[in-house]
């Protein structure tokens, strides 16, 4: 079988399997996370293989601030608008041998994903769109929302100036909200990437990494760029 035939067969298998996601629990399925959607394949591979995470100190500080931001904004969404927080979801495809787990930051008919950033983007990051898109698929919602909040040592100071009068479109200094429609093509691309990572996992061969500026934020930076580790 030549390369073209092989790719055609894989595409066919993926197309047939995309509609098989279901709720049945099957322990043999390889577990991916929605937050890994369309991120560096090598990073996902290392996580699946059980390599130890080593977060850079400056990233740890941002992670802590991000958690605090999630908690403060989450309480507002729950108290004022009745949203469920940290909603656990699972999409399963027995045919592909994989499942996608996730925790929606806030959910009530549609998902809201909260991202704390040191600077606010002009448009959503691709991998954030892919993560939210997984949640939209699970919820069967037409639209969801990405909330970007500027990181601060005291997130309440940022959130107290936010205008919720046009919720779920929210405005304020240090805050950006994006309404995002469900994208079937993006979901297929996400599943395809997870499936390809699964094949690398089964062969024990790491996939190519991104090798870009985001690498310095990765907990597996020490593997790809350290002097004390050889693949």
What are these regions (language model features)?
Residues 98, 123-127, 182, 186:
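Short, well-structured alpha-helical patches and their helix-loop capping segments
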Residues 71-79, 123-152:
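Metal-dependent nuclease catalytic cores in nucleic-acid-processing enzymes
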Residues 2-5, 141-231:
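Metal-dependent nuclease catalytic regions and adjoining charged, substrate-binding loops involved
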Residues 104, 133, 216:
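Residue-level detector of short, conserved catalytic/binding motifs and their immediate flanks
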Residues 1-111, 118-120, 124:
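Metal-dependent nuclease catalytic cores that hydrolyze phosphodiester bonds in DNA/RNA
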Residues 40, 135, 218:
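A residue-level signal for conserved active-site and pocket-lining positions in enzyme catalytic cores
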Residues 115-118, 150-151:
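A short beta-strand motif that forms part of the nucleic acid-binding face
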Residues 84, 107, 111-113, 143-148, ...:
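A structural signal for short, well-ordered beta-strand segments and their strand-loop junctions
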């Amino acid at each position: 079988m030549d390369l073209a035939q092989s790719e055609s067969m894989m595409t066919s298998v993926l197309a047939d399997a995309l509609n098989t996601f279901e709720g049945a629990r099957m322990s043999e399925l390889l577990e991916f996370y929605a937050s890994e959607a369309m991120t560096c394949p090598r990073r996902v591979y290392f996580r699946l293989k059980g390599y130890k995470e080593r977060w850079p100190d400056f990233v740890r500080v941002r992670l802590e601030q991000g958690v605090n931001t999630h908690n403060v904004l989450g309480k507002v969404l729950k108290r004022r608008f009745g949203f469920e927080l940290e909603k656990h979801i699972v999409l399963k495809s027995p045919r592909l041998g994989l499942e996608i787990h996730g925790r929606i930051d806030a959910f009530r008919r549609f998902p809201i994903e909260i991202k704390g950033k040191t600077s606010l983007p002009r448009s959503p990051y691709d991998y954030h769109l892919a993560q939210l898109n997984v949640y939209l698929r699970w919820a069967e919602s037409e639209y969801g929302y990405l909330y970007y909040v500027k990181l601060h040592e005291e997130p309440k100071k940022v959130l107290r100036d936010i205008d919720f009068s046009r919720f779920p479109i929210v405005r304020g200094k240090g805050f950006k909200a994006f309404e995002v429609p469900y994208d079937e093509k993006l979901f297929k691309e996400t599943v395809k990437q997870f499936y390809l990572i699964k094949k690398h996992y089964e062969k024990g061969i790491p996939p190519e990494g991104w090798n870009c500026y985001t690498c310095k934020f990765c907990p597996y930076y020490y593997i790809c760029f350290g002097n004390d580790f050889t693949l």
